[in-house]
Amino acid sequence: MSDFAFFALEALIKCIIIIAIFASLAGLATYAERKVLAYFQRRIGPDMVGPFGLIQLVADMIKLFTKEDIIPSNSQKFIFAIAPLISAICAFVSLAAIPMLPEFTLFGRVIQPIVADINVALLFVIGTSGLCFYAVFLGGLASNNKWSILGAARGLVAIISYESVGALALIAIVMLVGSFSLVDINNYQSDGFFSWLIFKQPLAFVLFIIALFIETNRTPLCLTENDAEIVAGYGTEYSGLRWGMFFIGEYASMIAGAILVTLLFLGGFNSFWIIPGWIMMIVKSSFIFFWYFWARAAFPQLRPDQVMKMCYLILIPLAVLNLLITALAVLL
């Protein structure tokens, strides 16, 4: 087999594995979230279908995929139909440039656990994951429903504002490392616990986490949907499989965000003491992923004006200040 054929086959297998694993993890994450929220609220959560309620995932999937797929008669039907697909595709494409685990050897060949090791991987991931929200915006706009349009518009204002916060936080990381490659950023933190970038850029870490909550539409910073204000927001008119694709795209983006935080700030997949790197990657990413659930259970939903004031009056000035301090540190 030629090198090109092997490369193409390897990339195809990696893509299939990523889609299969992360689609499954997205479903498992819904079960985990329901259990965590139940614990916070002194409830039991899913426990009737299968051991510990685990088969509830299958029951929910069957219910979701067999529901009637309704397209409103007054909607922009083509855009309404493809928006969920765009959301899911963008979420999975962003995973292509994220190194998941340390490299390993298989049948005498070194395998990189990444589909595309590009030198601007950070830009690629931020760009493609950001497109997920524009699919949400298109879906809300095409629904021709006042709640959907209002949710999409609120979310668009927030994402444009908070992407600036996230970008400024990441520029500080790039200035320190000198590369947009996620592999290079991971290797920069390979000298032990105190080489993790969270110790050099604690403010950038906090800013990026906040921006990530906006990017993934998570409470307490979710403006696209709110039962008390705009019903289900952009998803008000969606049902069945199309709603499920938005759902899968959202949770895949959450998983990608947790992995990205681990790579950027928490030492990535470098080994720690006697703990292998792949175990460290899973543990740290799971810990960050848990924050989504904890924040939803612990904090109330903020009003849109509070979210925007926090962005422009607090977070952007802090991000600019952090960038200036980092620039001075690099120059000196």
Swiss-Prot record:
Role description: NDH-1 shuttles electrons from NADH, via FMN and iron-sulfur (Fe-S) centers, to quinones in the respiratory chain. The immediate electron acceptor for the enzyme in this species is believed to be ubiquinone. Couples the redox reaction to proton translocation (for every two electrons transferred, four hydrogen ions are translocated across the cytoplasmic membrane), and thus conserves the redox energy in a proton gradient. This subunit may bind ubiquinone.
The organism's place on the tree of life at top rank: Bacteria
Membrane topology reported for the UniProt record: Multi-pass membrane protein
Record has GTP-binding as a keyword: no
InterPro entries: NADH_UbQ_OxRdtase_su1/FPO, NADH_UbQ_OxRdtase_su1_CS
Subunit structure: NDH-1 is composed of 14 different subunits. Subunits NuoA, H, J, K, L, M, N constitute the membrane sector of the complex.
Record's protein name: NADH-quinone oxidoreductase subunit H
GO biological process: aerobic respiration
Enzyme Commission number, as recorded: 7.1.1.-
GO molecular function, one term: quinone binding
Gene source species: Campylobacter jejuni subsp. jejuni serotype O:6 (strain 81116 / NCTC 11828)
EC top class named in words: translocase
NCBIfam families hit by this protein: PRK06076.1-2
Localization annotation: Cell inner membrane
Family recorded in the similarity comment: Belongs to the complex I subunit 1 family.
Entry keyword Nucleus: no
Keywords of the record: Cell inner membrane, Cell membrane, Membrane, NAD, Quinone, Translocase, Transmembrane, Transmembrane helix, Ubiquinone
Reaction equation(s) it catalyzes: a quinone + NADH + 5 H(+)(in) = a quinol + NAD(+) + 4 H(+)(out)
TM spans (from-to): 4-24, 44-64, 78-98, 120-140, 165-185, 194-214, 255-275, 279-299, 312-332
Main location: membrane
GO annotations of cellular component type: plasma membrane
Name of encoding gene: nuoH
